[in-house]
From Swiss-Prot:
Pfam families: DapB_C (PF05173), DapB_N (PF01113)
CDD domains found in the cross-reference section: DHDPR_N
EC number: 1.17.1.8
Record protein name field: 4-hydroxy-tetrahydrodipicolinate reductase
Catalytic residues identified in the record: 142, 146
Organism of provenance: Campylobacter hominis (strain ATCC BAA-381 / DSM 21671 / CCUG 45161 / LMG 19568 / NCTC 13146 / CH001A)
């Protein structure tokens, strides 16, 4: 029986991971880290002490915010433990910590734990190369409570397009248009964010040319999709060598390259 710990147990994803874990026969949630009171009554250790969390699990699943994730990674540097990191918008500090931790333990980091999004990302890479002269626009939609924009998944997709086309994303990405801005630049990659209602997540990558266009879409209808993906990723990363992996590695789409 594999023991998993949840870092961020009071959030929407932490709660869903605990619920979904009850459907797995080969794991147990053995510890939950949370600063806020839980709205459910788990049958495991609940703590706000990282040491206690780490001591009572085989791997940690993190869904928090930037500061919480960075605190976890800083602790993990001197207390290696397999980590499944789902927190997005980590910034340069968080990304550097991920790489540093990857030298001491197996870490899987994914801005989206969905199998469908992994396939969307793979198709986006292929389309970006084949349709090199097509304009690319990315649109993401989420619920009104989402705090960061663009979503981590949208940024991953944008990076995929830029890498496939040999572009520097920071130089070609835009996040909105307003006023007399002139014609669209040739290599521009637009990433647009919409917020409203209770939309779990929708991502669209469009390739547009004169006379034709193609759009690749993924819609998540339940957070259980991400929760189940995170649990499976945590089970996978436990058996890997030290390194920084992503969801494509877990699914066998490519080997670890970082």
């Amino acid at each position: 029986m594999t023991k998993l710990g949840i870092h961020g147990g009071s959030g929407k994803m932490g709660t869903m991971i605990y619920e979904c874990a009850q459907n797995f026969t080969n794991i147990e949630i053995s510890a939950i880290y949370s600063i806020e009171p839980l709205k459910y009554s788990p049958n495991c250790i609940v703590t706000n002490d990282l040491q206690k969390l780490f001591e009572n699990c085989d791997a940690v699943i993190d869904f928090t915010i930037k500061d919480g994730a960075i605190a976890l990674l800083n602790y993990a540097k001197s207390h290696p433990k397999p980590i499944c990191m789902g927190t997005t918008a980590l910034g340069s500090e968080g990304e550097a910590l991920l790489k540093e931790c990857g030298k001491k333990m197996p870490v899987i980091y994914a801005t989206n734990m969905s199998l469908g999004v992994a396939v969307l990302n793979s198709l986006t890479a292929q389309a970006s190369k084949i349709l090199r002269d097509f304009d690319c626009e990315i649109v993401e939609m989420h619920h009104r409570h989402k705090k960061d924009a663009p979503s981590g998944t949208a940024m991953t997709l944008a990076k995929t397009v830029a890498n496939a086309r040999g572009l520097d994303l920071e130089k070609v990405r835009i996040s909105g248009r307003d006023g007399m801005i002139g014609e669209r630049k040739k290599d521009e990659i637009a990433v647009m964010s919409l917020r409203g209602g209770d939309i779990v997540g929708r991502h669209s990558v469009g390739f547009y040319n004169d006379g034709e266009f193609i759009e690749l879409n993924h819609t998540a209808t339940s957070r259980a999709t991400f929760a189940n993906g995170a649990i499976k990723a945590a089970l996978w990363v436990i058996n890997q060598e030290n390194g920084l992996y992503d969801i494509n590695d877990c699914l066998g789409i490519k080997k670890c390259v970082r």
